[in-house]
Structure formats: C-alpha cells, structure tokens
A protein has these predicted regions:
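C-terminal substrate-binding/active-site "lid" region of AdoMet-derived donor-dependent transferases
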Residues: 185-252
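Conserved SAM-binding loop of SAM-dependent methyltransferases across substrates and taxa
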Residues: 109-122, 190
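S-adenosyl-L-methionine
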Residues: 129-176, 181
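N-terminal auxiliary segments of SAM/dcSAM-dependent transferases
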Residues: 1-65
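Conserved SAM-binding loop and adjacent beta-strand
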Residues: 3-4, 74-87
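Glycine-rich helix-loop-beta junction characteristic of Rossmann-like nucleotide cofactor-binding loops
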Residues: 92-97, 119, 147-148, 165, ...
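Conserved class I S-adenosyl-L-methionine
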Residues: 97-108
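Short beta-strand element of Class I
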Residues: 123-127
Length: 260
C-alpha cells in the first residue's frame, strides 16, 4: 500500500501540530471530529502519504499510514497489551525470522501476535492459544483490522496451550505471555525443536525467578533476562536533553535455548 493514495476502508494516522496522533478509518462522506474542529474524510481520500490537510478551523493535520506501533497503541483491547518498546526486542532476542514456525500462548488483544505474523510472513506459521474466548475475538478483529483480513498463516485457538502436545506439531520458537509459564513448560518444551528458542514475558521478579528456575531444570541453555527502558530526548538548536517523562518498567523478557 505504500506509495498508493489513501482509499476508503483503510486506516490513517492524523498527526496534529503538537504531535498528537489520531487513528481513523476512512469512509467516503465521513467526518473526523476532534478538538481542532472537523475534518471531512474526502480531503484525505485520494491523497498521498505525507499530505497536509486542514480542519474546518484551519488546523493542520499530517496524513500517514499507521505503523504497527501506532496501531498497537490505539487498537481494541480485551487484555493488556505488550507495548511497542518490548515487541521489537522480543522479536530480536527470540530470533523470529521469515518462514519460522512459532507457537504463542496468551494471545490477549493480539499485539505480539500481529508482530509475529508480520515477522514470519506468508511462508511461516503462527499458532496462538488463548483461554478466554472474548480476548481471542478481540485479537481476531485486530488482526483483520491491521492486515485487511486474518492472515492465512495465523491459527488462533481457543484453549490451553498444553493441548498442543497431542497435535504432532513442532515449532522453532515459543513465546509465552502467561502468568505461570513454568506450568506449561513440559508440554511446550516437547514441541520445541532442539536449538529452538523459548521466550517469556512477565511483570514481576518473583515470576521471573520461578520461570528461570524451571527453564534451567529443563536444561535450557543461554537463559537470559532483561527489561527495556525507553527514554526519548528533546533536541532543539540550543538545547539537547532527556524528555521529562520516560517509559520505564513494563515487563521482564526471558529467553533460553532448548538443548538436545
């Protein structure tokens, strides 16, 4: 879609003069109302990315297609999401590659699911388990909203991830966003191939201690835990300093590799 004009039915990020972002679905004849006035959708439809449009009060808005990070922060939620600052490091530390077979547990609202689907691409496969049907439907809707349709390589399953042990499937990567990942380690470890990577996402140190102990008992190697602290900077001609606010702790990321 990059390089093509905006069309009805797709999403646009509208960026105001103060850097505030608004995620809007474009409809012919529709209108976006906000504190800066009203913006007819028809002013955006047919225009290119990076175009500046003006509301009824003359306020300027820049038009861009949403990044995954924009979508994750604005999408529908059933459960708390993994934030963009953690999604990138998870994909890199778990070495999620195009064509990979990935097992996820704890779909939630689908933020990590979307990132995994885009990372593995059509040649890969993402199987995602969620025990709460209402969360799974939110994730399904978000996948359809972001990709235009639910990707053919995404398999959303209503149930306990331990059920995967009886399917005969094997995976190269396993990612667990569960409060007690150690409780499913035997089953997910059985379907993870030798050299495969297991990644957990947990909010507290107590949970991390128990998860790491279980991974070491199961003979996982290179077990490592880290967190990501994001600090943006204010850069001006006469001043360069950290911004007054930063995004600190959101969760601990633990990775380990399965041995033969």
């Amino acid at each position: 879609m990059n390089g093509e004009p905006f069309r009805a039915g797709e999403r646009v990020v509208l960026l105001d003069e103060r850097g505030r972002r608004f995620l809007v679905r474009l409809e012919g004849g529709g209108t976006f109302h906000y504190h800066g006035g009203a913006l007819p959708h028809d002013l955006v439809l047919g225009s290119e990315e990076g175009t500046t449009v003006h509301s009824t009060t003359g306020a300027s808005l820049l038009c861009f297609r949403p990044r995954l990070a924009d979508f994750v922060l604005k999408m529908g939620r059933g459960a708390q999401v993994i934030y963009p600052k953690d999604l990138g490091p998870i994909l890199i530390s778990a070495d999620v590659f195009p064509g990979a077979r990935v097992l996820e547990a704890g779909t939630g609202s689908g933020a990590l699911t979307l990132a995994l689907c885009r990372a593995v691409g059509p040649e890969g496969r993402v199987v995602s388990y969620e025990r709460r049907a209402e969360f799974l439907e939110v994730a399904r809707g978000n996948a359809q909203d972001f990709f235009g349709k639910v990707p053919a390589w995404l398999d959303l399953r209503d149930g306990d991830v331990r059920e995967v042990a009886g399917t005969g499937e094997t995976f190269q990567r396993v990612l667990l966003d569960l409060p007690e990942p150690w409780a499913v380690l035997d089953e997910v470890g059985a379907v993870l191939g030798p050299g495969g990577i297991l990644c957990t996402y947990l909010p507290t140190t107590g949970q991390v201690q128990e998860a790491v102990a279980a991974m070491r008992d199961a003979r996982f190697a290179e077990v490592e835990t880290f967190e990501v602290l994001l600090r943006t900077w204010h850069v001006a001609p006469r001043s360069v300093r950290p911004d007054h606010r930063m995004v600190a702790h959101t969760g601990f990321i633990t990775v380990g590799r399965k041995t033969a």
